Amino acid sequence: MKKYSKKDRQMKLQVAIEENPFITDEQLAEKFGVSVQTIRLDRVALSIPELRERIKHVASVTYADAVKSLPIDEVIGEIIDIQLSKSAISIFDVRSEHVFKRNKIARGHHLFAQANSLATAVIPNEIALTTQATVRFVRSVNEGERIIAKAKVRPATDNRAITIVDVKSYVGDEIVLKGKFEMYHATQK
C-alpha cells in the first residue's frame, strides 16, 4: 500500500468522503493504511463531520422534500435512501437511552418505531396512517448495534386507499425484525 504524505492523504480523504459520505473512519483508515485516530484527526483538521452527522446532513438535504407523509425530523432513524411508493432504507444506532439498563437490550418500541415511521415515509401522500401492523421480533438488539431497516411497498390491490408495506430490519446480515404494515393514505384537502 502506498504511503501518502499528510497533505496528500488529507486531499484524498476529502475526495473519498465527497464520493461516498457514508464511508466509515475504519474503512478510510484501511484504505489509507493509517490508524482510525489519524483519520479522525484529519477529519477535524479539514472540518469534516463524523459519519453520523454526514448521514444526517445528506438525508435532510436529499429527502426533506421527498417525504410528504411526515416531517423528516419525525422519522425514527435516518433515511439514507427512499423511492416513494417503492422502497426506503433507514439506519438507527442503538445508544444507551434506547436500552434496558440491566441487560443493555434495545427496547422493542424503538425497533417498531423505526419500521413504522419508514413505512409511513415511503407513502407519497400527505396523510399516511397505520391501520394494522403485524410485527415479529426475531432476535434482541444490543446497545452499540446499528439497525438497518428496509421497506418495500407491495403492488397496489383493489383498495387504492390501502397500501401494504413490508419492512425487514437487520443488524449486519441478520434479520432482527419483520413487519407488515397496512397503511391508509389520502391527499389532504
Swiss-Prot record:
The keyword Repressor applies. GO terms for molecular function: DNA binding; DNA-binding transcription factor activity. Keywords: DNA-binding, Fatty acid biosynthesis, Fatty acid metabolism, Lipid biosynthesis, Lipid metabolism, Repressor, Transcription, Transcription regulation. Disulfide bonds: none annotated. GO terms for biological process: fatty acid biosynthetic process; negative regulation of DNA-templated transcription; negative regulation of fatty acid biosynthetic process. Belongs to the FapR family. HAMAP family: Transcrip_fact_FapR. Transcriptional factor involved in regulation of membrane lipid biosynthesis by repressing genes involved in fatty acid and phospholipid metabolism. This is Transcription factor FapR. It comes from Listeria monocytogenes serotype 4a (strain HCC23). The gene is fapR.
